[in-house]
Amino acid sequence: MRQTTIVKHKEVNKKWFLIDADGVVLGKLATLTASILRGKNKPDFTPNVDMGDNIVIINAEKVVLTANKEEDKKYYSHSGYPGGLKVINAAKLRAKKPIAIVEKAVKGMLPHTKLGRQQFRNLYVYAGSVHKQEAQQPVRIEVK
């Protein structure tokens, strides 16, 4: 009879992946990224261990929002004071901070716990095609 294997944090081998977001739908990009960050693509997935890989996303400013989401999708933040609700749509957020749309989509798909925050730190998003992780030699992944 086989025993259940439990992976320890020290036993995890993290790889580096590169995803080009040029012309890719935001939802497909975010689901693939969140799955890899959690490590769900590995056969020995353990939900309580950070066993996900590192991901570099380039050309985040060229990600595609379907339908009329560019104007209709709203991002909310609150200052904590009465009347402190701030609302910005996707078009203005893209003009102000292009990487924020991708980061918010991926962060919303990760667990809202300490482990989820730790896994989110393995994501590197760049607006253009130049990135600082050349030395890690990331493997390119195509989003379908």
From Swiss-Prot:
Identify the domain of life.
Answer: Bacteria
The portions of this protein that span the membrane are none
| SUPFAM superfamilies named in the record | Ribosomal protein L13
Disulfide bonding pattern of the chain: none
A Pfam family that this protein carries is Ribosomal_L13
The answer on whether this UniProt entry bears the keyword Transmembrane helix reads no
Entry GO CC: cytosolic large ribosomal subunit
What Gene Ontology biological process does one annotation of this record name? translation
Keyword annotations for this protein? Ribonucleoprotein, Ribosomal protein
Q: Which GO terms describe its molecular function?
A: mRNA binding; structural constituent of ribosome
Q: Function, please?
A: This protein is one of the early assembly proteins of the 50S ribosomal subunit, although it is not seen to bind rRNA by itself. It is important during the early stages of 50S assembly.
> What interactions and quaternary structure are annotated?
Part of the 50S ribosomal subunit.
The similarity annotation says:
Belongs to the universal ribosomal protein uL13 family.
The protein's name in its UniProt record: Large ribosomal subunit protein uL13
Q: Which organism is it from?
A: Mycoplasmopsis pulmonis (strain UAB CTIP) (Mycoplasma pulmonis)
